[in-house]
């Protein structure tokens, strides 16, 4: 008789309990076919999480296959815990972005904190030491108290985990729109550095080699977290609060240091973080990649309390855990290491020469599954898309009130300074941060060298909703420009695809078109995709979020000397690079004045992006520029105001544009601040003004003149978000 009371095989089938776990009738029947029998309760649980959208990408695999994944600098692409890219001198950068959207909607602090912890462990499992964190966040408008609470909880969670573990949060982006009401997006990115000969893989091979568990003892937290992340958010989602994991950054710090020491042991065969689907995914994926079988002895798994069943052990997503495969006979060496770091650890199984994934508790078998069926035989769904009906009417901007529009845009939380939020993050721990959060990409020095890694994370959801194909190209190009703006050579990217339900034809078409655009941009800009994540079913009460592909990109700065005086001063001249057109569809001014997204903006020219990018990068590296800013949300006037306010400098400019064009968001533009006595050699650059030491921001065109005190702009811009949050405890 079994030690654990669970539903019988007959009950699972007759009462269709598998549906509650996330399997459809067809998927359950396929499991029966694979096993040659009906599955027991633990086996159904294992298939349900491994075949969930979150783990199997069953609706998105066809789109992911089109991304370019190889390139001159790529050492390791998709398939492992994170991507690895060469930066010279036998060193590499390791990076990835992951989503933690659904957990953050239910429990914002822990959802965000464990998102940070999970992405850190992905980087550490490759053998890299993390050097910085980034995040991309989306919330509903801050006029809604629930959105204020979500924002405060998420920011506290990010800061609480990152600050405790000692990794600086150096860049990010946050946007607000009512399409994210009840369904915030929390995408966390981590970047690390490693020597080539220390790169690890998550593989289990070598018959008789041992499987070691290390980290927090397994509890009941996070059970079916992967399945929960693959569903729409509903009013019943609150009841799934136990599916949200609990983070412990202090144990996370110990685990990180112990892991980085363990990878120096020659006897280490493979290592993987226990992330989504916990012990199930880490063990079965390692076996599949190693072409081996595994036998786990679950009575040896460290548990937080007695009575935890094999089903619960395998599906728990308790945080701060790693799984290792080590050479037989060397187990004690690793156990002693983990004891030194005050971590629980145990030998819980061994590699076999079969193709079976076998789970035992004492002498009872709780699962016997073909390994490859979990990793490679999940169903893949190719659905039909359908173009949405676009709003093609033209909005009228001819009578725009420049001053009023400027002031309203400046204090909208999407455009306002995020200083109030970022100051809650430790930005300098490690003392290698060169450029902190604010206006630009992050730049972090590679310790012991004169090199630096630049990183950015970006999204353009309104544009992707407007025109998915062009919007997909645009988000990759935006990240590319942001790296160029600090003088970095873009190397590769990671992506997080946040969409609604793929079972809706319009959403599926957005996936088709936007990923096609992203893929084309990656090819032209030579930024292959080396890692990523997909988060679907981001819907609340039947309303989908905007399609929000987020791109994290890294670049290399071979010599940081030019950054020593990369800081604007009074007397430095301002140049605009790039043509300004009447591009308002998807823009912030369109949202402010008309609300809905109009289907109108011109295609992005990727070849022109490359040509301009090289010219701008060379200008920065030659020491001519003291600051470069991409022209982004809100348009040229807002971009100039942000530069002026951020540095506390006056600004005077005369621009040959219409009033409306001051707020146009035409892509591919840069503001270059040129040092006194230097000459800018970019043919299409137009001098538009200069920075001053006067407390005045003055921009004129043929129609209007806007004159404001810089100190007042700075106060409004930097204080807007704090002002929004004063209404919540």
Swiss-Prot record:
Q: What is this protein called?
A: Phosphoribosylformylglycinamidine synthase subunit PurL
According to its UniProt record, where is this protein located?
Cytoplasm
What is this protein's function? Part of the phosphoribosylformylglycinamidine synthase complex involved in the purines biosynthetic pathway. Catalyzes the ATP-dependent conversion of formylglycinamide ribonucleotide (FGAR) and glutamine to yield formylglycinamidine ribonucleotide (FGAM) and glutamate. The FGAM synthase complex is composed of three subunits. PurQ produces an ammonia molecule by converting glutamine to glutamate. PurL transfers the ammonia molecule to FGAR to form FGAM in an ATP-dependent manner.
Identify the InterPro entries for this entry. PRibForGlyAmidine_synth_PurL, PurL_linker, PurM-like_C_dom, PurM-like_C_sf, PurM-like_N, PurM-like_N_sf
Class of this enzyme: ligase
Family annotation (Pfam families): AIRS, AIRS_C, FGAR-AT_linker
Keyword Magnesium on this protein? yes
Q: Which GO terms describe its biological process?
A: 'de novo' IMP biosynthetic process
Instruction: From the UniProt record, give the pathway where this protein acts.
Output: Purine metabolism; IMP biosynthesis via de novo pathway; 5-amino-1-(5-phospho-D-ribosyl)imidazole from N(2)-formyl-N(1)-(5-phospho-D-ribosyl)glycinamide: step 1/2
- Specify which residues bind Mg(2+) 1 according to the UniProt entry for this protein: 98, 533
Where is substrate annotated to bind?
Answer: 99-102, 121, 245, 317-319, 535
Has keyword Metal-binding? yes
What reaction does this catalyse?
Answer: N(2)-formyl-N(1)-(5-phospho-beta-D-ribosyl)glycinamide + L-glutamine + ATP + H2O = 2-formamido-N(1)-(5-O-phospho-beta-D-ribosyl)acetamidine + L-glutamate + ADP + phosphate + H(+)
EC number(s) stated in the UniProt entry for this protein = 6.3.5.3
Query: In terms of domain of life, where is this protein from?
Result: Bacteria
What positions does the entry give for ATP binding?
57, 96, 495, 532
- In which organism is this protein found? Staphylococcus haemolyticus (strain JCSC1435)
State the oligomer form and interacting partners: Monomer. Part of the FGAM synthase complex composed of 1 PurL, 1 PurQ and 2 PurS subunits.
Which residues bind Mg(2+) 2 per the record? 122, 273
What GO terms are given for molecular function? ATP binding; magnesium ion binding; phosphoribosylformylglycinamidine synthase activity
Q: What does the organism's lineage look like at the top?
A: Bacteria, Bacillati, Bacillota, Bacilli, Bacillales
The UniProt entry, under CDD domains, shows:
PurL_repeat1, PurL_repeat2
């Amino acid at each position: 008789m079994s030690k654990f009371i669970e539903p019988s095989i007959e009950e699972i089938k007759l009462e269709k309990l598998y549906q509650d776990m996330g399997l459809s009738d067809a998927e359950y029947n396929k499991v029966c076919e694979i096993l040659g029998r009906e599955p027991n309760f633990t086996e159904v649980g294992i298939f349900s999480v491994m075949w969930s959208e979150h783990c199997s990408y069953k609706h998105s695999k066809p789109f992911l296959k089109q991304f370019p994944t190889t390139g001159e600098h790529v050492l390791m692409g998709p398939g492992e815990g994170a991507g690895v890219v060469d930066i010279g001198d036998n060193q590499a950068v390791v990076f990835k972005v992951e989503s933690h959207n659904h957990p953050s909607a239910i429990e914002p602090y822990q959802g965000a904190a464990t998102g940070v912890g999970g992405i850190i462990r992905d980087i550490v499992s490759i053998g890299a030491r993390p050097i910085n964190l980034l995040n991309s966040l989306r919330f509903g408008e801050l006029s809604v108290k629930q959105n204020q609470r979500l924002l405060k909880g998420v920011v506290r969670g990010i800061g609480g985990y990152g600050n405790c573990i000692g990794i600086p949060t150096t860049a990010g982006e946050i946007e607000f729109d009512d399409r994210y009401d009840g369904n915030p997006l929390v995408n966390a990115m981590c970047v690390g550095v490693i020597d080539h000969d220390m790169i690890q893989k998550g593989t289990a091979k070598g018959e008789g080699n041992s499987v070691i568990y290390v980290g927090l003892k397994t509890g009941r937290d996070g059970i079916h977290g992967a399945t929960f992340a693959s569903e729409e958010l509903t009013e019943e989602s609150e009841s799934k609060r136990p599916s949200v994991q609990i983070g412990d950054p202090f144990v996370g710090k110990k685990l990180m240091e112990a892991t980085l020491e363990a990878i120096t042991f020659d006897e280490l065969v493979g290592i993987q973080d226990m992330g989504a689907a916990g012990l199930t995914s880490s063990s079965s994926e390692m076996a599949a990649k190693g072409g081996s079988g595994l036998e786990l002895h679950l009575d040896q798994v460290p548990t937080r309390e007695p009575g935890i069943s094999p089903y619960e052990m395998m599906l728990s997503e308790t945080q701060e855990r790693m799984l290792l495969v080590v050479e037989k006979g060397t187990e004690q060496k690793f156990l002693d290491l983990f004891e030194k770091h005050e971590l629980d650890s145990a030998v819980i199984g061994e590699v076999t020469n079969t193709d079976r994934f076998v789970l035992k508790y004492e002498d009872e078998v709780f699962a016997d599954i073909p390994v490859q069926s979990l990793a490679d035989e999940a169903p893949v769904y190719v659905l039909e898309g359908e173009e949405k009906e676009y709003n093609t009417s033209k909005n009228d901007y001819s009578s725009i009130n420049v001053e009023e529009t400027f002031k309203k845009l400046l204090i909208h939380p999407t455009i306002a300074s995020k200083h109030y939020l970022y100051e809650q993050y430790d930005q300098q721990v490690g003392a290698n941060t060169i450029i902190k959060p604010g206006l630009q990409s992050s730049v972090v020095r590679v310790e012991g060298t004169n090199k630096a890694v630049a990183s950015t994370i970006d999204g353009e959801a309104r544009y992707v909703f407007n025109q998915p194909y062009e919007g997909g190209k645009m988000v990759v190009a935006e990240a590319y420009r942001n790296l160029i703006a600090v003088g970095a050579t873009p190397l590769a990217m990671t992506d997080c695809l946040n969409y609604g339900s793929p079972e809706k034809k319009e959403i599926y078409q957005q996936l088709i078109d936007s990923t096609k655009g992203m893929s084309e941009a990656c090819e032209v800009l030579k930024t292959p995709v080396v890692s990523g994540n997909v988060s679907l079913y981001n819907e609340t009460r039947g309303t989908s979020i905007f399609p929000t592909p987020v791109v994290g990109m890294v670049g290399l700065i071979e010599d940081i000397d030019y950054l020593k005086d990369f800081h604007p001063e009074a007397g430095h001249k301002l140049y605009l690079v790039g043509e300004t057109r009447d591009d308002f569809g998807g823009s912030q001014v369109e949202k402010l004045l008309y609300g809905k997204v109009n289907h109108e903006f011109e295609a992005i020219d990727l070849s022109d992006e490359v040509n301009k990018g090289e010219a701008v990068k060379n200008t920065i590296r030659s020491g001519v520029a003291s600051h470069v800013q991409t022209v982004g949300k809100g348009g040229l006037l807002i971009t100039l105001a942000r530069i002026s306010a951020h540095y506390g400098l006056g600004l005077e400019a005369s621009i040959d544009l219409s009033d409306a064009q001051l707020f146009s968001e035409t892509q591919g533009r840069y503001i270059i601040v040129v040092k006194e006595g230097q000459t800018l050699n970019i043919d299409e650059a137009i001098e538009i003004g200069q920075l001053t030491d006067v407390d005045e921001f003055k921009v004129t065109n043929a129609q209007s003149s806007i004159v404001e005190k810089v100190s007042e702009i700075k106060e409004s811009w930097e204080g807007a978000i704090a002002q929004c949050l004063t209404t919540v405890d």
